[in-house]
């Protein structure tokens, strides 16, 4: 039996509220629960991953810092950054013949961004030793996942049209001097719009993971 996939359009929402909702969803889901993708933007916030080191926050600012349970180091979220959280029952995918590891899920997320950027004529790439997506050495997309009971939550953050200045207050993802990029550096302001980019991003991701598109349902909240 093919499972439904629910796409939730959450708009702009507080990071901690969304994070706790992801935890609750994952803790309470059953083997019958549909997988979900949450599309959201967060007001300004720095988030530290589980292995996050304090020294990667270079200076104190008015922006709050939240200690998260995702993988990875510190990053920044702000308006104009498209976040895609993937709440997927990985162990169930394996029983359906889609033998996917956590590393393969990370690769699927990276490839969905690479394919999305290619739709705009932008060449990008992933790095085996530093998860994310890059353009000419600059990072345009950050990744961080948590796996609990064989199910994923957290996901990716793709810079679309945002203020990149707060990244200068951190070593992004733990890399000193790492420069950041965004879609608005390469396309018109009209094209660099989260509402236009997110459908392409989702389309590529669900295609890579092999979801039946007749079983995909969009919900705007």
From Swiss-Prot:
EC code: 2.3.1.181
Keywords for the protein's UniProt record, in alphabetical order: Acyltransferase, Cytoplasm, Transferase
UniProt-listed Gene3D superfamilies: Bira Bifunctional Protein, Domain 2
Stored Pfam families: LplA-B_cat
GO cellular component: cytoplasm
Pathway(s) of this molecule: Protein modification; protein lipoylation via endogenous pathway; protein N(6)-(lipoyl)lysine from octanoyl-[acyl-carrier-protein]: step 1/2
UniProt-annotated catalytic positions: 173
InterPro entries in the record: aa-tRNA-synth_II/BPL/LPL, BPL_LPL_catalytic, Octanoyltransferase, Octanoyltransferase_CS
Site label Lowers pKa of active site Cys, positions: 139
Subcellular location: Cytoplasm
Signal peptide (UniProt feature, chain positions): none
GO biological process: protein modification process
Sequence positions that bind substrate: 70-77, 142-144, 155-157
Domain annotation BPL/LPL catalytic: ranges: 31-213
Catalytic activity field: octanoyl-[ACP] + L-lysyl-[protein] = N(6)-octanoyl-L-lysyl-[protein] + holo-[ACP] + H(+)
UniProt-listed PROSITE patterns: BPL_LPL_CATALYTIC, LIPB
GO molecular function, one term: lipoyl(octanoyl) transferase activity
Further comment: In the reaction, the free carboxyl group of octanoic acid is attached via an amide linkage to the epsilon-amino group of a specific lysine residue of lipoyl domains of lipoate-dependent enzymes.
Function field: Catalyzes the transfer of endogenously produced octanoic acid from octanoyl-acyl-carrier-protein onto the lipoyl domains of lipoate-dependent enzymes. Lipoyl-ACP can also act as a substrate although octanoyl-ACP is likely to be the physiological substrate.
Assigned protein family: Belongs to the LipB family.
Protein's name in the database: Octanoyltransferase
